Amino acid sequence: MLNSFKLSLQYILPKLWLTRLAGWGARKRAGWLTKLVIDLFVKYYKVDMKEAQKPDTASYRTFNDFFVRPLRDDVRPVNTDPNVLVMPADGVISQSGKIEEDKILQAKGHNYSLEALLAGNYLMADLFRNGSFVTTYLSPRDYHRVHMPCNGILREMIYVPGDLFSVNHLTAQNVPNLFARNERVICLFDTEFGPMAQILVGATIVGSIETVWAGTITPPREGVIKRWTWPEGESEGSVALLKGQEMGRFKLGSTVINLFAPGKVTLAEQLQSLSVTKIGQPLAVSTELFVTPEAEPAPLPEEEINAEHDASPLVDDKKDES
């Protein structure tokens, strides 16, 4: 009964105006009132402030400053294996798995269209048909900066206007085509693992979506699709980001969807629905292992070569092998 009421509110409430109001309030500097709101938020959602660079809530001038707070450098170590792609966000796995032609799993018994998610861009959709996907939900308590799973060169960004449904598990299970309906920012990267899309999905109360290369993408909300492109390769004007580097952020929580081309990566076995994710942990592994070539030793001078041949071993073979 309660869930039915919550779902009804999703269709009845003026979500755009609520989002604008929340965004306005989150930008305001209100002194002691801002601190009070932050303290209540931290207590209600059990936010771990020990991970933040500034654990004292009094150090944040606005609620937005608190919400996009940076973490200490040591709390999210990034897996350095060149074959491993890492989690882009703190949160929980909503769904993950194979893209079946044009179908992506939203929740048990509910699929949505890959092409619709990509705003009808069938050329981009063709890159990912029968590939793999991971959907990560960021709850209000989570760190809300989004990072790169691997090194990447930005090729395209698309802003897609849309609804502002909540993107929690209740709505994912009950609102058809949720992620293809909501406002979103699609980022396409060239990577050593093939093309990768990282999609930032908006929601109710999400005041803005930002990227590190373009700043605030939304608002304003003008109701039209916008598209930007960048040159191929690392040339002047290109945007190249490193594995683990910040690429964007939400001001209030939402969802990140990653798309990978077929046959390029194998998703990590621990990716199960509702499993907790932390930035830097394994997301996927390359199907083609990259091996860093070992440098050949420099040739020895002739007298040293002769000395090596003449010398007797100083340790026995068994001890030398250890």
From Swiss-Prot:
Transmembrane segments: none annotated. One of its GO terms (biological process) is phosphatidylethanolamine biosynthetic process. Coiled coil: none annotated. Keywords: Cell membrane, Decarboxylase, Lipid biosynthesis, Lipid metabolism, Lyase, Membrane, Phospholipid biosynthesis, Phospholipid metabolism, Pyruvate, Zymogen. It catalyses: a 1,2-diacyl-sn-glycero-3-phospho-L-serine + H(+) = a 1,2-diacyl-sn-glycero-3-phosphoethanolamine + CO2. Its cofactor is pyruvate. Pfam families: PS_Dcarbxylase. It is found in: Cell membrane. Residues 294-322 are annotated as: Disordered. One of its GO terms (molecular function) is phosphatidylserine decarboxylase activity. Signal peptide: none annotated. Is synthesized initially as an inactive proenzyme. Formation of the active enzyme involves a self-maturation process in which the active site pyruvoyl group is generated from an internal serine residue via an autocatalytic post-translational modification. Two non-identical subunits are generated from the proenzyme in this reaction, and the pyruvate is formed at the N-terminus of the alpha chain, which is derived from the carboxyl end of the proenzyme. Its main location: membrane. Belongs to the phosphatidylserine decarboxylase family. PSD-B subfamily. Prokaryotic type I sub-subfamily. This is Phosphatidylserine decarboxylase proenzyme. It comes from Citrobacter koseri (strain ATCC BAA-895 / CDC 4225-83 / SGSC4696). The gene is psd.
